[in-house]
Amino acid sequence: MRPLVVASFPVKRIEDLRLIENFLDSDLIELRLDYLKDISIISNYYEFLDKYKSKLIITLRDKEEGGINQIRDEIKVKLLKELYDKGFLYDVEASFLKRNDLPYDNKIVSAHYFKYLPSRKEVEEIVREFSEKAYSVKIAIPSLRGYKEILLPLLENEKITIIPMSNNPLERIAVGLLGSKLVYSYAVEPLAQGQIYYKNLIKILNYINDMITSSGVT
């Protein structure tokens, strides 16, 4: 069984939401709402988004978390609570959850490290703390010396999503084959290094999955 392919889509203008229809052949579509100048406007479009709910991941990432525009904590808390009440899947940073009382059951809890490698103990503690209730715990770390030794043991957990922040797209494919729950790709333009166009990623993973299935390899 292959991992779920996430097509990440930057919503730069609210009108871009109409383009969701173009990416419904992906398993999931990540709406990167932090590209919007005024993120609070999304409250007016919950009814529109509702028909795509089963396909969507809503991401509100501020600059400290690798986002594009700064989002005030109080606005983010308000929107996440609204999204929770309406049953949307969202992605929230573990550090934000530790500062704010927010529900995360059946949601994606992330930890992004951009400039240094965390210890294996640190990431294991995050997985242990959040994995029981979360839909997935996502760990993203840079491709510095020793990063594979930190990421690969995490794949024993069926809820884990790992992202090697490497320029080599093969690494994203590899972790998906090794057990990452989600593999992130791009819908229109790469939003992170190493991302592959989602249609190509689906073809690659389906081909490998079919080859394994037909050969009887388990």
Regions found by a protein language model. Give the residues of each.
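Structural recognition of alpha->loop->beta junctions
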Residues: 25-27, 73-92, 127-138, 174-196
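Catalytic beta/alpha-barrel core
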Residues: 8-10, 28-38, 59, 80, ...
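Short, acidic/polar
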Residues: 9-24, 72-82, 118-129
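Conserved N-terminal beta1-alpha1 strand-loop-helix module at the mouth
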Residues: 1-67
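Acidic (Asp/Glu)-rich catalytic clusters
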Residues: 19-25, 40-56, 81-85, 98-107, ...
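C-terminal alpha-helical cap/extension of soluble enzyme domains
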Residues: 152-218
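Active-site-adjacent beta->alpha loops and helix N-cap segments on the catalytic face
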Residues: 35-49, 93-106, 118-122, 143-156, ...
